[in-house]
Amino acid sequence: MKPLVIKFAWPLPLLLLLLLPPKLQGNYWDFGEYELNPEVRDFIREYESTGPTKPPTVKRIIEMITIGDQPFNDYDYCNTELRTKQIHYKGRCYPEHYIAGVPYGELVKACDGEEVQCKNGVKSCRRSMNLIEGVRCVLETGQQMTNCTYKTILMIGYPVVSCQWDEETKIFIPDHIYNMSLPK
């Protein structure tokens, strides 16, 4: 009687295919990613991610909603500020963005203001009791961050802000300006 392996040689390669592949002995690390500046690395990760973005830090919130070094009266204010501050959502232009012309400490007082409905009707916002100068940036053309063109509109009004709890300072802080309601 002859053994089966010699009589039928083709099952041997099939049996070898059924063996489990060897397990890798280490974790995969992309060392090139860790050579980048941490802020650049976080920006790339957020830009390429498919899930929700991480909440901005207090420093980033202050940068996004308060005036920069450039004067308000510049006709191209929104285009330059929104590009230099990199204000976008995963590379896409915001249709509208407000920037307050007061220090952030003054804007924090808006979280103690009157509760009003936000523009989108979903959230509960707070309206400041103090008139402030601000800029409304309205998207004119473009969809991607590199080709956004904004119209700059100077305003004086009551900022309508959404507020979030800050664990460090233990107070509510404004995180987004939804509107600037005009005085009556």
From Swiss-Prot:
Key word DNA damage present: no
Annotated localization: Secreted
Keywords, comma-separated and alphabetical: Disulfide bond, Glycoprotein, Secreted, Signal
Signal peptide start-end: 1-25
UniProt KW Nucleus keyword: no
One Gene Ontology cellular component annotation held by this UniProt entry: extracellular region
Single annotated GO MF: nucleic acid binding
A family per Pfam: RnaseA
Described purpose of this protein according to its UniProt entry: Does not exhibit any ribonuclease activity.
Protein name (Swiss-Prot/TrEMBL): Inactive ribonuclease-like protein 9
Species the sequence originates in: Mus musculus
Organism lineage string: Eukaryota, Metazoa, Chordata, Craniata, Vertebrata
Gene giving rise to this polypeptide: Rnase9
